[in-house]
Amino acid sequence: NRYLEEEQNKNIEYENGNVEWMEEMIEEYGEDGISHSSYSSTLSEIAYFDGRYVSFCQQEYDYQGGAHGMPLWIGLTFDLETGERLSLPDVIANSEEELNSIVTEYFAEYINGNPEEFWEDALDIVRDEICFESDFYLTEDGIKFYFHPYALSSYAAGFPEVTIPYDEFEMKISLQSGEQEL
C-alpha cells in the first residue's frame, strides 16, 4: 500500500535522524553526559474490518521531556479491493454542511453533558472545524470523530470523541457487520 509505505519511510527517516542526533550528543558530551530521556511509541488498533474495508486508529505517543508527552491519533480507512485510503467524501454522500451539522449535534450533547471538562468555546471550535478533512475512523457502531488533547479541553481530558451511528449518514459504501449489512 502506497500510503503505508510512505509512512514507513517517514518513520525510518525520523528514527535515522534520532540516531544521528544521539551520536552527536555522545560525541559532544560523552556517554555519561546525556541526561535527556525521550521516547516515542506507535500502536495501531483495528476498529473495523469486514473483508472489504479496514479502519484503524494509529495511536502515537512522543515524550521529549517535561510534564508529559504528546499523544496523537491518526484515523485510517482503506478499501482492501483498491488499496486506496478513503476520505470522508469517499465514505458518505452528505454535504460538508450536513456533516458539520450532524457531528456538531453529537458533540453538543457530549459537551453539554460534561461542561466542566471543556473550554468555554469548545462547541464553537467543533462547529468551525468539522469538515471533510476532519479526523475519523470507522467502528462497528458508526463513524468515530475525535479531537486531540488541548483542542477542546485540557490534556487530562484526553481525546474528546463521539461515535455517530451509520444511519445518521447517507453512506456511499456498504459495510458488513457479521451477517448484516450496515
Predicted regions and their residues:
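Compositionally biased intrinsically disordered regions enriched in Thr/Gly
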Residues: 1-182
